[in-house]
Amino acid sequence: MTSGAIADAPARRSAVSGVPQRLSAALAAVRAHVVRLRGPYGVAALTFGVYLLLSIRRYQHYQVPSWDLGIFDQAIRNLAAFHAPVSLIKGVGFNVFGDHFHPVIALLVPVYWLAPTAMSLLVVQDLLVAASAFVVTKAARTVVGGYSGVALGLSYAFSWGLQEAVVAQFHEVAFALPLLAASLTALVAGRWLTCALWALPLVLVKEDLGLTVVVIGLLVVLRSRGRQAALGGALAAWGAAWFVVAVKVVLPAVNGQGVWDYSRQVPWGTLSDPVTVAERLVQPTEKLHTLAYILGITGFLALRSPLVLAVLPTLAWRFLSDTPAYWGRLWHYSAVLMPIMFLALIDAIRAVRARPVSSRPSLLRAYAAVAAPVCATVAVMLTINGLPVRELVRPSFYRPDARNTAAERVLALIPAGSSVESDAGLVTYLTDRDDVYWMGRTGNPAPEYLLVDGRNGGWPTPPSDVVAYAEQLHPGTTYVKIFDTDGYVLVERVTG
């Protein structure tokens, strides 16, 4: 061996011996990453499992709170067949893109190619909630550490706003949850471009979320400088532009009446008076109760973060509206507020911890340290006090009752391909096989069958004489009753 070869040998041995060292370091990094993600994945899996069980059992037990699931089922079924997203429940030939600006629902078309059923929408919604729980938990662990981060993630996942949204069944705002969580997580971390990229699609989820994007853009302006501030301004302009385009151009053009329907729910003429506006925002007191719940789930600590401003557009349209259903805690209207509030909480904790110890008020520092268990306690207490997840520990929740059997029997009497007019009770269970109309809407053609749920049919108020009601709705027809059990009444058209 030459002297040069001998001299090169140690270098080769060093290079070879460095390979396992680098491999070991890489494996250690991967292992550390897996450990960091184990908590978020666990929270997401638990969230999906719990909500999927809740969704399936409620659906199997015919616990349907409204017609919305049926509307989305009809619309997406038509999209999947390359037709306009028409829902007969909303009206003959009614295009749902004239109801709300939510083109994001087109993403569900491949789902319907694989599994064309309303249950698929519930599964997708549960997945979206779980995905947002993953993002929030990951953000929380970054700021407050392992166990506290998981506690905050679980508090978010089972917050009252998300529980109510799940039992309200599918709505397009479910898509906003992971988008908001990811955008605000990036905002907290100072990743301005990432924040903007996740916020951009929110304008395609629902028209009012364009205003939420405006606030997110302004928050970027507030927190950044130079080009990043310009990025925030552009994001705010994007949100404002899409809001205007949606409510002034798209919705009136697609809506059969040439208007944005929901603009009628706000008395715009009274909003020029600041006193009137202030009164409408706080009266009746149900609005203040809702606000207390929204802030209370974070132990009110979220108020120390400017991110909390992102709730204002949603609260404004809800509280200024004349529609009482918007003021309270039920339904899905508070779902989009949950990721905002919990990311604001995480941001507030981060800000408190980032300040020098000498400048932190001792009480605030101590409170921020226990924010995770406080939020977890609030979530548990609210659930015990009557939130939907509590149903899962009741044995009766898993047992079918006489009403379930009656529902199955009455649905079996309606042949596939029939035209049916129904209240909200069983409408969702017919949309996959029949032409289904809502009986509270004028202008429907005379259906072959009219179905009423006399106990849980929602609105309109169930008629005492269904045959007479059907013949009054559709003059010149004759109906006969063919089923009347446990509150379900089915009549069939025989003439007309």
Predicted regions and their residues:
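Start-transfer (signal-anchor) and selected internal transmembrane alpha helices
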Residues: 1-53, 192, 227-235
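Signature aromatic-anchored transmembrane alpha helix within multi-pass, membrane-resident enzymes
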Residues: 41-45, 236-240, 352-387
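Transmembrane-helix signature of polytopic, membrane-embedded enzymes
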Residues: 41-42, 119, 131-158, 177-178, ...
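Membrane-lumen/periplasm interface segments of specific transmembrane helices
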Residues: 50-54, 61-64, 78, 226-312, ...
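Extracytosolic helix-loop segments that constitute the early lumenal/periplasmic catalytic or substrate-binding loops
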Residues: 71-95, 103-104
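Short acidic/glycine- and proline-prone juxtamembrane loop motifs at membrane-interface regions
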Residues: 165-173
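Membrane-interface transmembrane helices that cradle and orient dolichyl/undecaprenyl
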Residues: 175, 180-194, 221-222
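Hydrophobic/aromatic-rich transmembrane helices and adjacent perimembrane loops
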Residues: 309-360
